[in-house]
């Protein structure tokens, strides 16, 4: 199966994985399937020593693709299937046999935060941020993944207010290893 949303280029023992689902790299069912396929393949590649995950455009990943759910008639089991494939799309990164570096090129929101939190090392451009905006659409989610990175107080602030933690604060808190100019992120 070829992938169209999760792109992977390999050079010099580095797998550069790019989320390319315009306009905001939202997580659709196809996104989740391709993420699992790409990271499972990377785990089996002897010539790959590290993977770097980033997003195409101005957003790393804006979270769940709500638009893909509009107009769909729910069938029995849909909720559980969606939850399971979402979890697996995070676990394939956490369980990858190669270290995975997240290069936050822009905001990682909701499920996008979970993707970033699943990586082994995080770096960000000055435009990177992490947030849980679900409260703005009447939902509450993502806290489990945020708690792997943040303390209870900041996680609650993010969940209850939609606060986005900017790259400078992520660095100050020790969540990310470096902040770069946007044009230097992938160097």
Predicted regions and their residues:
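Short, histidine-centered active-site or binding-site loop motifs used for metal coordination
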Residues: 19-23, 73, 104, 174
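Conserved CoA-thioester-binding segment of acyl-CoA-metabolizing enzymes
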Residues: 1-56, 91
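Crotonase-fold acyl-CoA enzyme core
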Residues: 2, 92-187
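A secondary-structure boundary/capping signal
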Residues: 20, 55-56, 62, 105, ...
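Glycine- (often His-adjacent) and acidic-residue-rich active-site loop
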Residues: 34, 47, 55-92, 108
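Residues at secondary-structure transition points
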Residues: 5, 26, 76-87, 127, ...
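Hydrophobic/aromatic residues within transmembrane alpha-helices
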Residues: 17, 53, 65, 115-117, ...
């Amino acid at each position: 199966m070829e992938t169209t949303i999760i792109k992977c280029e390999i050079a010099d023992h580095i797998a550069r994985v790019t989320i390319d689902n315009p306009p905001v790299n939202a997580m659709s069912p196809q996104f989740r399937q391709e993420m699992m396929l790409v990271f499972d393949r990377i785990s089996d590649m002897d010539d790959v020593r590290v993977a770097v995950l980033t997003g195409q455009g101005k957003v790393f990943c804006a979270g769940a693709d709500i638009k893909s759910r509009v107009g769909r008639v729910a069938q029995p089991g849909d909720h559980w299937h969606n939850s399971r494939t979402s979890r697996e799309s995070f676990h394939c990164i956490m369980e990858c046999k190669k270290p995975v570096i997240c290069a936050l090129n822009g905001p990682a929101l909701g499920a996008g935060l979970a993707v970033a939190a699943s990586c082994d090392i995080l770096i960000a451009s000055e435009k990177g941020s992490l947030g849980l905006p679900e409260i703005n659409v009447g939902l509450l989610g993502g806290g489990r993944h945020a708690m792997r990175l943040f303390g209870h107080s900041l996680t609650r602030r993010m969940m209850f207010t939609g606060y986005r933690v900017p790259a400078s604060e992520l660095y100050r808190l020790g969540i990310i290893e470096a902040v770069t100019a946007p044009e230097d992120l992938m160097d």
